[in-house]
Amino acid sequence: MLKRADDWGGPDSFPHMSCGWAVATDAPFKWTKQMAADFGGTRNGMVMHWPAGFEAKGEIRSQWHHVNDVAATVLEAAKIPPSKSINGVKQKPLDGVSMLYAVKDPDAAERHTTQYFEMFGNRGIYHEGWFARTIHRAPWEHEPRRALAEDIWELYKVDEDFSLVNDLAGSNPKKLAELEALFMEEAEKNQVLPIDDRSIERVNPANEGRP
């Protein structure tokens, strides 16, 4: 794989791998892509480079952020306000927040404090250092493990447990219930409901109303 790294993702590659290798390449996390309920499916490193704009060089930031923060960051750097209307169509407010504050101050309190995740019924919610999630199905499983309402939720303290290993659901049921309720609030606000947990059926154009 390393010998062909530059070809990965190009027209001569088929960038899929067996489940075992998928898990291995997502270390130190336990799950893979498609798993919205695990950082192995959602978490990636990010490099920010702006020689004319950043005094910090080669430093690490640990504030929690999401890909939806990129647009807000670019707009702030360019000193451009978000568009309120495009071609007469009113625009929704940006979900994300700019990350420039973290570049300027490594000790600044994080500003992206809540983020939901959902894919194929796998769900997760990050909130102020906590992460709750439920595994509805593995990527290689074509049927759910149980009904959505019967899924088992887990709870993790992200700033103390980077790899999501120590499930605190049993010792902190109040916090877990709080995050489960918050997930439903965020899901409703972002048009996630009703949750569609189908897999193979969703790639059938006839089911999606398109040719």
List each model region and its residues.
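Intrinsically disordered, low-complexity polar regions and short flexible loop motifs
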Residues: 161
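C-terminal cap/loop subdomain of S1 sulfatases and analogous C-terminal strand-loop tails that border
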Residues: 10-39, 54-63, 67-158, 190-193, ...
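Catalytic cores of eukaryotic secretory-pathway lumenal/extracellular enzymes that build
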Residues: 2-3, 7, 35
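Active-site-proximal N-terminal segment of extracellular/periplasmic enzymes that hydrolyze or transfer
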Residues: 166-174
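Extracellular/periplasmic ectodomains of large secreted or surface enzymes and adhesion receptors
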Residues: 167, 185-187, 198-211
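A contiguous, mid-protein "functional segment" used to position or interact
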Residues: 173-192
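Active-site-adjacent bridging/hinge elements
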Residues: 42-50
